[in-house]
Amino acid sequence: MIEPKCARCPDRPCSRGLPEGSPLPGFCPIQNYKSLIDEVVKEYRGPAVRDFYLAAALTEKNGYDARAAREEGRTVPIRPRIRELAEFARAIGARRLGLAFCSGLHDEAGRAAAILEKHGLEIVSVICSCGAVDKTEAGVPAEHKIREPGAFEAACNPLVQAEILNRLEPSFNILVGLCVGHDMLFTSRSKAPVTTLIVKDRLTGHNPVASLYSRYYRDIV
């Protein structure tokens, strides 16, 4: 089986449509996974996916200036992601959303919740330190603590965050700054779909693409 390497593709012909016989890179999944693609695309019309998929398409469309897109062929963004989350929730008829956040981003989580509530949504939120569990109770060796090994240091508790929100049955959950790995544990345990508002990057002010663009990060990545 040939592994896809789309991140290395120089032309992205799939984003422009493919006339019959168009040349494709050898690693292109369009030619190596054609039957799989044809089969899975049918699922977007099915009841399990259709509403989410159409709402996502509408949210994407409404995120751009309509006149610039239709008349000038330009994609000019007009909404930030937090607004798109509110509009997407409205499009799927959501009333309650879950918010799982890192204690280090408590202020940002509060601001996000307030904005979403302004749009008429009910927000249920759970902090990562919920439970006040010391890291050693969760199996982390004391020497792996960030500060003093003998002092209390709250363990991140993504499974508890997910399980509490599972019982509250939000339409979807929003992540705000969970650590690498903890975000994966939360996502794997959450029964509701999960999206991310803020991805944690301590060094860049939670803007991980900065380390891809700036030469100042070159020696530390």
Map each language-model feature to its residues.
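An N-terminal assembly and electron-transfer interface module characteristic of large anaerobic redox
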Residues: 1-221
